[in-house]
């Protein structure tokens, strides 16, 4: 049995999406048990519509719901101990749950997670890891917005953690890892990127295969299983990719409506277009993982539908089932033992 805590108030639609999404996840994984946190007047009526889910769940009342517009510091002050978001995270800390899922405010969720769960030993800064559809399947990209900037050691930590996530999700024994750079040549890029590359070349790890530098166009190609970058660049890349996907979808729709011949052609090609739409649908690869914490926290898109929230739950389910934290901690311990003298710098939080 896998226990998952849910911030039922998170996201643009709150319980109206969160609860149906959890119900879908339960249909696919009957061994999940949920703990929902939220405002009783909003959560209980929706939960009552799903008898099977209600029977496999526990509801715990909260006093506060964190707004999508709240600043992290405000959310922490107002919501500590009594908000649905904090209580869902705290359930992981106390052992009541093995993973927490929220579609709420990203900055608030990160601040509360760091404050409540703390960081893994020897990890200074968390990263948000996103699942990216590619020509070869799926890749993991991190950091996509937890912090701005990263030094060499932090980038290597991201590489180790991202590889652990790839093993858990993709069941790849030794994921390939690349550092995002302005070119593939070793002489190109910022000093911290070149230093991180040197460290990864000099410190062989059983859990990953370092493939060198990759460029922006390699992300969509699926050149490597894990793409490592710092949060500012990663967040821009993520938003650019999402925007491009929407743009391409709209351009295709316009083209198919332009002439009678195009409309007839669409009828015959509808199956192919449907498969393309499904491949590019953010709801199919929803769920950003907060890596570096001493517990599993998954961030769902705030605008996700029920299928999207279900995807985020399934990411958490796979993380627990494949013992993600234990694997990452073991890999990090090996790296820091092998390379204990890498310097690091501070940084400031990025808003995703």
Swiss-Prot record:
What Gene3D superfamilies is this protein classified in? Isopropylmalate Dehydrogenase
Q: Which reaction is recorded as catalysed by this protein?
A: a fatty acyl-[ACP] + phosphate = an acyl phosphate + holo-[ACP]
Q: Where in the cell is it found?
A: Cytoplasm
Pfam families recorded: FA_synthesis (PF02504)
Question: Under which pathway is this protein filed?
Answer: Lipid metabolism; phospholipid metabolism
Q: Describe the function of this protein.
A: Catalyzes the reversible formation of acyl-phosphate (acyl-PO(4)) from acyl-[acyl-carrier-protein] (acyl-ACP). This enzyme utilizes acyl-ACP as fatty acyl donor, but not acyl-CoA.
According to UniProt, the name of this protein is Phosphate acyltransferase
What organism is the protein native to? Brucella anthropi (strain ATCC 49188 / DSM 6882 / CCUG 24695 / JCM 21032 / LMG 3331 / NBRC 15819 / NCTC 12168 / Alc 37) (Ochrobactrum anthropi)
Q: Which gene encodes it?
A: plsX
